[in-house]
A protein has these predicted regions:
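Karyopherin-beta/Importin-beta family HEAT-repeat alpha-solenoid scaffold
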Residues: 2-898
Length: 898
């Protein structure tokens, strides 16, 4: 770029395009050109010209930004003898803009701040004190108030610029220390401005923002004491409230603050003094004020609970703070419509509990005596806050508000689960007693919301805590059928509570019939889709050996809802998984009979779809049916090899003899699946759905899968010959992992499969390449034990190595290097004698795998790989290092974190 009138004209045109041209392409071009201009050597010259007062603010802003970029990023380009001149010019410009455009003033202040950070402490030892002195000096041309605002802006951006600066780490520590000492020049000025009666609101607001900025430099809390007290006073001024809250919270929340316990203790009374203001705000519906005061109370309690708990003689004042936070937790109204404050407090209760439970036993017992009643009160408050509003009110909520409320309830659930650690079984007893009184009190009928909240509390705890030994669960199971369910939200919670107790039901099967009818009835309600289906799945998984008496009814109800298509796809898949668990515990004849009635309608539908011309509509239907079969076979496992249950007579039965029902079904539908596949071989989603059926079957069937091997091999060959798909390669890998003797199958062309795998390594899609790498890491360990594999690797291994090295050399994404490294590791471990020859021959090719690496670097890499046959992590590091060399990226900042 050249500098002169022509360049200035180009700058003005580009800026005009950037701000005013409606064409987005022109804007982008202008922005690109301007960014280059900002970093050019000429920027030192044109920046000052653009700051002329006759220019519009947009142009002036660009000039100020260019100065900041040059100072912050290209500091080393500035000769030391020009530092003072640059400093003086910036002071002059800031003084000129003190009464001008605020955005330009801020940018100039940021530029001077960057200059100060680069110069201090050697070249500018008292930078902050000098800034204060310069702006306090009388200047007849500039209004005193404007000068004050300019100084406050400069002092505010200085710590902010430090936080984002690119200073080296050793310099950062040095400069932080200097700035912390310089607060002695800043804080007295801020205190004076806050205390002056005639200081206008906007000046005080700027002072509080400046203080907020400085406390983040880890200034000792005792040095901030006067300003924190002044900020508390400012909370009474509505104009200053938000800024004062931010200042107090930032000061209290500094990690170093806990060292200054005496100062923290002094802060409790002013925080407690805000309670009346908080109550008035709640009564008048002033959400902003209640939110701000709550933030202050939580900041003090959450950040310093351990330090304050340790001050035993002040236990009453800390307990008062805890009760103030409890008030914030239970603030009236429904979150997030009437209040947004209560959610801020939840992490405080975690922190307080952790700190109490971390004390040694004797001390902990004392604190438990004080705080257990507080936590029981907290449970009541949280369950009240978790209650749904009236149906009428809830109907007016937006979908976003409903989603926020759902997340809020999840947070409450997590808190209740955590509180159980402190309150133990007594908490469950308390919830059970309240629910019992609620359901049996005929004189005062309760709202469904109250019942739902108590059940929600039970569910929250039972989902994660082992309640199998609780003496209240039998009573709860007995109470559930007495609940009058007239509402979707209540019904959902009843379902989820039953699901959470499924493990308990497995140990107490006599109680299953108390709740199973409720679950089956709920299955027919689309509004209860997720809760009813997930609960049935849990019951079928945990209690399957006790469900044969109910199996016919469960299958019939499930089949009916599946045929009615009232559930979404994912719930249909869960339902099939539930039926798979259920059928696994039946006799083979019963399984086959149920399978026939269950899947025949889908097979008939699939036959019809297989005859149709492929289109988007029938594609979705095909994928849905294949998904149903796949999910059924995922959990239908008659081998019981994964079951830990051995207590009942049913579970002691030997593994059933005869054909595996899944194999019987697969053999019956195989031709149909092949027919579907023949029309959809080029569609990755359909191929993936087909592969999923067999992949999940292989996992559960193990040796029983043997009868399917010839047909599966033929189908895989058909897929490979058309187009290698990631899902097909994954299926092959899974099959090889479970049954490596698949390679002994006479129908299998191992060489063709191997070559398809090599071809797939060169595909642009990462999932395909990952799957191919996984295939080879399963295949190569078999080359010593399975002759056909060994022969193919011996004859074609060099081609595989060539493809791997090409990928490492730059043909594949760097994110895939770990996967390529695993192939190299497997080759070295299982084919060492071949690899040492192949890698030498491959590396002798000129420019291979990259023209950027020298023969010496290639030789070093080869020797490193051949030496490492134990540590896979080291091989991955070698490959990452070598690929950077191949790509010309080694040692660049671009790859610093690679």
């Amino acid at each position: 770029m050249f500098f002169g009138s022509k360049m200035l004209l180009c700058l003005f045109q580009a800026l005009h395009q950037l701000y005013y041209d409606p064409n987005i392409e022109n804007k982008n071009l202008a922005q690109k050109w301007l960014m280059q201009a900002q970093v050019s050597p000429q920027a030192w010259h044109f920046s000052w010209l653009l700051l002329n007062m006759d220019k519009v603010p947009e142009i002036q802003y660009f000039g100020a930004s260019a100065l900041h970029i040059k100072i912050s990023r290209y500091w080393n380009d500035i000769p030391a003898d020009q530092y003072e001149s640059l400093k003086s010019q910036l002071f002059t410009q800031i003084t000129r803009f003190a009464s001008g455009s605020k955005i330009v003033l801020t940018r100039l202040c940021v530029a001077l701040a960057s200059l100060a950070l680069s110069m201090m402490p050697e070249a500018w030892p008292c930078a902050v004190a000098d800034m204060v002195r310069m702006f306090q000096a009388e200047d007849s041309n500039v209004d005193g108030r404007a000068r004050c605002l300019a100084l406050l802006e400069l002092l505010t951006v200085l710590p902010e610029e430090f936080q984002t600066s690119r200073l080296p780490q050793y310099r950062k520590g040095q400069v932080r220390s200097v700035l912390a000492q310089e607060c002695g020049s800043v804080f007295p000025l801020l205190e004076q401005l806050l205390q002056q009666q005639d200081s206008p609101g906007f000046i005080k607001q700027k002072v509080l923002k400046c203080f907020s900025s400085w406390v983040q430099l880890e200034i000792p809390l005792m040095d901030c004491e006067n300003l924190i007290q002044a900020a508390f006073t400012s909370l009474q001024d509505p104009e200053l409230f938000d800024t004062a809250v931010e200042a107090v919270v930032n000061a209290i929340s500094q990690p170093d603050a806990q060292r200054y316990v005496n100062t923290l203790l002094k802060l409790i009374p002013p925080v407690l003094g805000l309670q009346e203001q908080l109550r008035q705000a709640v009564q008048s519906g002033d959400m902003e004020t209640s939110h701000g005061i709550c933030r202050i109370a939580v900041a003090l309690g959450e950040n310093h609970s351990r330090a304050l708990l340790d001050q035993v003689e002040h236990w009453q004042s800390f307990l008062a703070l805890v009760n103030m936070i409890m008030f914030c937790t239970g603030i009236p109204g429904h979150y997030p419509v009437n209040e947004t404050t209560s959610s801020l407090t939840l992490t405080f209760w975690y922190t307080l509990q952790d700190d109490i439970l971390s004390f040694e036993p004797d001390k902990q017992a004392v604190y438990q005596q004080v705080y257990r009643p507080v936590y029981f009160q907290l449970v009541d408050v949280l369950l009240h806050k978790a209650q749904f509003p009236s149906d009428e009110e809830y109907g007016f909520w937006s979908s976003d508000e409903k989603e926020q409320f759902r997340i809020y309830r999840v947070d409450i659930s997590d808190t209740l689960m955590y509180v159980y650690e402190m309150l133990g079984a007594e908490l469950l007893s308390s919830l059970y007693d309240k629910l019992g009184r609620l359901l049996t009190n005929t004189e005062q009928p309760s709202t469904w919301q109250h019942t739902e909240a108590l059940l929600y509390g039970f569910q929250s705890i039972a989902e994660t805590i082992d309640v199998n030994y609780s003496d209240v669960v039998p009573g709860l199971i007995g109470l559930i059928p007495r609940i009058s369910i007239s509402n979707v939200q209540l019904a959902d919670t009843v379902m989820f509570t039953i699901g959470a107790l499924s493990e308990w039901l497995a140990d107490h099967p006599v109680m299953i019939n108390n709740v199973l009818p409720l679950v089956l009835q709920a299955l027919g309600n689309p509004e209860l889709s997720i809760s009813s289906v997930s609960t049935l799945k849990k019951i079928c998984r945990e209690c399957k050996y006790d469900l044969p008496p109910y199996a016919a009814n469960i299958v019939a109800v499930s089949q009916e809802v599946l045929m009615k298509q009232i559930h979404k796809t994912s719930q249909c898949m869960w339902l099939m998984q539930a039926l798979g668990f259920l059928l696994s515990a039946l006799q083979v004849e019963e399984i086959l009979k149920n399978l026939h009635s269950l899947i025949t309608p889908y097979i008939q539908q699939l036959e019809k779809l297989a005859d149709e011309t492929p289109n988007p509509s029938n594609k979705l239907a095909i994928i849905h049916i294949l998904g149903l079969l796949s999910n059924l076979f995922t959990t239908l496992d008659i081998s019981h090899h994964d079951d830990d249950h051995e207590s009942t007579e049913v579970k002691k039965l030997p593994v059933q003899q005869g054909p595996n029902p899944v194999v019987v079904v697969l053999q019956q539908v195989f031709q149909l699946i092949q027919k579907v596949l023949s029309k959809w071989l080029n569609d990755a989603q359909v191929v993936e759905s087909v592969c999923a059926i067999f992949e999940k079957s292989v996992k559960t069937l193990l040796d029983d899968f043997a009868p399917m091997v010839p047909q599966l091999c033929e189908m895989l060959g058909q897929m490979y010959s058309t187009i290698p798909q990631a899902s097909a390669i994954d299926l092959t890998r899974q099959a090889l992992k479970r049954k490596p003797d698949l390679f002994l199958c006479s129908n299998l062309d191992v060489k063709a499969v191997f070559q398809c795998g090599v071809l797939s390594l060169k595909f642009p899609e990462a999932p395909t390449v990952k799957a191919s790498c996984g295939f080879f890491t399963e295949l190569l360990p078999r080359c010593g034990e399975i002759a056909p594999v060994g022969q193919v690797v011996h004859e074609n291994g060099k081609v595989l190595l060539q493809a791997v090295l090409e990928g490492i050399g730059g043909q594949a994404s760097r994110s895939l290097m770990d996967h390529f490294a695993e192939i190299l590791f497997a080759l070295n471990k299982h084919c060492f004698s071949y690899l040492s020859i192949w890698i030498k021959e491959a590396m002798q090719q000129d420019g291979f795998p990259s023209a950027r690496v020298s023969p010496e670097q290639k030789e070093t890499f080869s020797q490193q790989i051949l030496r490492e046959r134990v540590n896979k992590r080291r091989v991955k590091e070698m490959v990452k290092e070598f690929t950077l060399l191949c790509r010309g990226l080694h040692g660049t900042e671009y790859t610093a974190d690679y």
